[in-house]
Curated annotation (Swiss-Prot):
Enzyme class name: translocase
Main function: NDH-1 shuttles electrons from NADH, via FMN and iron-sulfur (Fe-S) centers, to quinones in the respiratory chain. The immediate electron acceptor for the enzyme in this species is believed to be ubiquinone. Couples the redox reaction to proton translocation (for every two electrons transferred, four hydrogen ions are translocated across the cytoplasmic membrane), and thus conserves the redox energy in a proton gradient.
PROSITE patterns reported for this sequence: COMPLEX1_30K
Protein name per the record: NADH-quinone oxidoreductase subunit C
Domain of life per record: Bacteria
Gene Ontology CC annotations of this record: plasma membrane
Main location: membrane
Gene, per the UniProt record: nuoC
Lineage: Bacteria, Pseudomonadati, Pseudomonadota, Alphaproteobacteria, Rhodospirillales
MF (Gene Ontology): NADH dehydrogenase (ubiquinone) activity; NADH:ubiquinone reductase (non-electrogenic) activity; quinone binding
């Protein structure tokens, strides 16, 4: 007997095949990732793909729930842009991904979903992902004088500038970062390294203490 969960997964697989057949040059591949439907799309075609997912009768993903950036510094195109969509009509979700580099503009989808406006601004602010034809691509979460993009993997933990209110000047000032103590790196990999070696042998997962990491 087929469970409701199995029926849902099978329905998503059928939907994925439909999307792949309808957009053969715009979709790189369609896959199931942890029982969720995921579409890897061509970057220049992202607006076309989202429009199809919104308007097709079998899809009807009428809500763009979120746009998220992901940073993989070792990749040639270091950024992934992830579009999470919801179909209230079919009670289904789908995830669409494209890749981009620091110098590659991503087409804005604000004409497809107005909610993309602030999502794209946040991705620009936090990652430096540039969205072409965006109506107002300004920083959203950080202040106007902020340097860099805070959620990139290579962004320093301390940032580049310290922002504070100067009581004498009666305004906000920007200064070089001054730490109250030296920056320290804490190593949490080996919680048992201070224990007796005989005791450590019965505790799993401490490869570093044994000199294997």
């Amino acid at each position: 007997m087929t469970s409701v969960f199995e029926e849902r997964v099978e329905s998503l697989k059928e939907l994925g095949a439909r999307i792949e057949a309808a957009l053969p040059t715009d979709v790189v591949r369609v896959e199931m990732a942890k029982d969720e439907l995921q579409v890897i799309a061509q970057r220049p075609s992202i607006a076309k793909v989202l429009t199809f997912l919104r308007d097709d009768s079998a899809c009807r993903f009428s809500q763009l729930v979120d746009i998220a950036g992901v940073d993989y510094p070792s990749r040639e195109e270091r950024f992934e842009v992830v579009y999470n969509m919801l179909s209230m009509h079919h009670n289904q979700r789908i995830r669409v991904k494209i890749s981009a580099s620091e110098d590659t503009p991503v087409p804005s989808v604000t004409r497809v979903f107005s909610s993309a406006n602030w999502f794209e601004r946040e991705a620009w602010d936090m990652y430096g992902i540039f969205f072409s034809e965006h109506p107002d691509l300004r920083r959203l979460l950080s202040d106007y004088g902020f340097e860099g993009h805070a959620q990139r993997k290579d962004f320093p933990l301390t940032g580049y500038k310290e922002v504070r209110y100067d009581e004498e000047l009666k305004r906000v000032v920007y200064e070089p970062v001054r730490l109250s103590q030296d920056f320290r790196t804490f190593d949490f990999l080996s919680p048992w390294e201070g224990m007796d070696r005989q005791i450590r042998r019965v505790l799993p997962g401490d490869e570093k203490a044994e000199g294997n990491a």
